[in-house]
Amino acid sequence: MTILTIEALRTEAAIFSAAESIHPEPLLYGVTDGKAVGTYIEQKFRLYLKEHYEFVQGNSASGIDFPGLLVDVKVTSIRQPQSSCPFKSARQKIFGLGYSLLIFVYDKIDNSTNRTATLNILHTIYVSAERTADFQMTRGIRNILANEGNKDDLIAFMSDRNLPVDEIEAGNVADEILRNPPMQGFLTISNALQWRLQYGRVIERAGQEDGILTVYRNNP
């Protein structure tokens, strides 16, 4: 059986999105829980791939759906395009999550006549790992560096932005930024016990920025 690659994952995601958008599903009729819809799509997509490809499946230890490819699948409604992900380190907000995202953005339509639901996949977007940092955080840091900012400026900025780090860690992160300036991120990441990821900007910018790819778009 063929080994799954990132290119194949994106190709199959486009095919899956088109098929799912015209599939009437009785199990989802009347379901309003976004998590249930997300689980449905993730499991169905994984089973679809297993028919054709070999790949390492994610588990609670790896924390992502395709650990062999360093890709996690996210499913979100167009009405509120966001989801959560595990908080590992405050550095993720600056340097990225450490893995890429494959995001399915759907609009759920219930049909009361035949009591089915259709998940109209409006956008499927691939965000490469280096673009998964927070937009405003990375833009501010890159502006500081462009204007001859130093370690003190970076620490003050992180404090102003309420990055969840103590003074020592802020100094370590500032040193790392000076050694390895971050790329511009495109997610909006809110501080919480889990990161809250918001996808409005990647939906807007898909296909216009390096590392943010339009895998599928449903043209009405």
Swiss-Prot record:
An individual GO BP term: DNA restriction-modification system
GO terms assigned for molecular function: type II site-specific deoxyribonuclease activity
Keywords from the UniProt entry: Endonuclease, Hydrolase, Nuclease, Restriction system
Record's catalysed reaction(s): Endonucleolytic cleavage of DNA to give specific double-stranded fragments with terminal 5'-phosphates
Origin: domain of life: Bacteria
Enzyme Commission designation: 3.1.21.4
Enzyme's top EC category: hydrolase
Reported function: A P subtype restriction enzyme that recognizes the double-stranded sequence 5'-TTCGAA-3' and cleaves after T-2.
Name of the featured protein: Type II restriction enzyme NspV
Species in which this protein is naturally found: Nostoc sp. (strain ATCC 29411 / PCC 7524)
